[in-house]
Amino acid sequence: MTDRIPMTPEGYEKLKEELDRLIKIERPAIIKAIAEARAHGDLSENAEYHAAREKQSFIEGRIQELQAKLARAYVIDPSKINQNKVAFGAKVRVIDIDTEEEKEFHLVGPDEADVKNGKISITSPVGKALIGKEVGEQVTIKAPAKTFNYEIISISFE
């Protein structure tokens, strides 16, 4: 897995903060919880011990996952991108040609995507359709249930 993961500076920092929290706070706390549970005696019927070990396994797995993502991260500063076209990190305002409803999409890397907050992956159908387009251009996005027709009304990089 040598594929680079595009990421905004904010997304990179968010993952770093989570990793730091897991290593500096969560890991020591679970080690302490395991030691305390172990002190209660028979481990075969010690629910606290087994729960703590399970949580430790989850934490260690997440630490490894975050370390791998951060190692493969390619941080892209949107402010240094050609701002005439939709690109990674752009906030794109569109109008649905059929319903005249306005929407805003923030194009981010796959690990930062959060559809509920308008952050869509550049690898999603919407992201792929918008990349490289300019204000005034129209895009058609075919979804399983419906086809969307958007016109780009603004592009910004913040």
UniProtKB/Swiss-Prot annotation:
GO terms for molecular function: DNA binding; RNA polymerase binding. InterPro entries: GreA/GreB_C_sf, TF_GreA/GreB_CS, Tscrpt_elong_fac_GreA, Tscrpt_elong_fac_GreA/B, Tscrpt_elong_fac_GreA/B_C, Tscrpt_elong_fac_GreA/B_fam, Tscrpt_elong_fac_GreA/B_N, Tscrpt_elong_fac_GreA/B_N_sf. It comes from the Bacteria. One of its GO terms (biological process) is regulation of DNA-templated transcription elongation. Residues 47-73 form a coiled coil. Keywords: Coiled coil, DNA-binding, Transcription, Transcription regulation. PANTHER family: TRANSCRIPTION ELONGATION FACTOR GREA. Belongs to the GreA/GreB family. Necessary for efficient RNA polymerase transcription elongation past template-encoded arresting sites. The arresting sites in DNA have the property of trapping a certain fraction of elongating RNA polymerases that pass through, resulting in locked ternary complexes. Cleavage of the nascent transcript by cleavage factors such as GreA or GreB allows the resumption of elongation from the new 3'terminus. GreA releases sequences of 2 to 3 nucleotides. This is Transcription elongation factor GreA. It comes from Thermodesulfovibrio yellowstonii (strain ATCC 51303 / DSM 11347 / YP87).
